[in-house]
Amino acid sequence: SKHLCHPEYPIPNSLGYIMLAYPLIAFILYYVRSRVFIRKESWKRIVSYVFLLIAMVAGILYKKDPMEQAYRYDYYARLGEWQKIVSHARAHSVRDMDALIYLNLALSKTGRFTSDLMRFPQIGEGGFIPHDPKSRMGLIVASEVAWQVGQVNAAQRFAFVGVLSSQRCVQPRLMKRLVETYLVTGEYRAAEKYIKILESNPHYRDWATAQRPLLDSVACASEDWIAAKRAMLPITDNPLDLTLIFPNALAFLIDDHADNRPAFEYGMGYLLVYKDLMTFMHYMELMKERGEAFPVLYQEAICLFFAAVQKDPEAFRSFPISQEVQNRFLQFMKVARSMPPAALKQQFGDTYYYYAQFIPTPKRQ
């Protein structure tokens, strides 16, 4: 099933109710099998209709749609309300792979990828990007992730496939992405084609008309978001598909532009989720050489690496690890085996070393 099954997710209460209700209902039916409670046929019909109505109302009011959260996040993403995705996930956790992909994307969009990644259950590559997407939502979110990490051509391809596979080859949301990608790559005639299509739709007309001035190459080059995307365009030929070979495709992007923050964060997030600390430390050495600041998540992983994988005090001291992070890690090492699991999770559940020690490593796709 595409819906999450993860050690950190509690078993839903509804499953327990179903298991308890089945023997109870069977016992009641056996007990009343030969009894007659209502003799008039008219009353029998009324009672049956009332019970049917109650069942229908209960089904409508208390149903749990497994895709509800994913569609909610898809709606927020369409409006660009990324903070609402993060806030909802904090309040209700995450119940679906597509929802988790949107959540991780929202963390990247809001600049909280490194600070909040370990606050939510991670399931591996399937939580970062859909694998070989075919559905409308899969293609949309794959295009969103590719756009975020700077692989513009991949974002364009996913959007184009989504448009072709939609009814009457019309999918305004993906057409907007096609306009954006064509503007970034300087294919102005292709961009104008989709601008014309969107201008014929009253709902998207204003947005499409606002893009028309960007069909001029000079105006386009001076637009901030386009300049930012062009600055991160791949330099070397990158034939790898993000949805099939995610870490390798990201490595190409990082090698081309070390300052591509979203691609770097996704790449480091992938390595940490799969507990590949050796490869992770290769990138940490490069960060150290560039004199960059280390997020707390990376500091925690570095502490774990030098404590459990390669004990080298001198090398450890060469990294800018804050005293607070070191003290918390030492406290964790001291109480990890003696503290009750619930208390340990409450105190250290948002740290990388807790994840590495107690959460099973996802299987690679």
Regions found by a protein language model. Name each.
Residues F27, V36-Y49, T110-M118:
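Short, charge-rich, low-complexity alpha-helical interaction segments
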Residues S1-F37:
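Membrane-embedded alpha-helical segments of integral membrane proteins
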Residues L15, K44-F51, F158, Y194:
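Alpha-helical transmembrane segments
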Residues G59-L240, P247, D255-Y274:
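Soluble catalytic regions of membrane-associated enzymes that act on cell-envelope
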Residues F252-L253, D312-Q365:
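Terminal, low-structured helical/coil segments at or just beyond the last alpha-helical repeat
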Residues K40-D65:
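Internal/C-terminal transmembrane anchor helices
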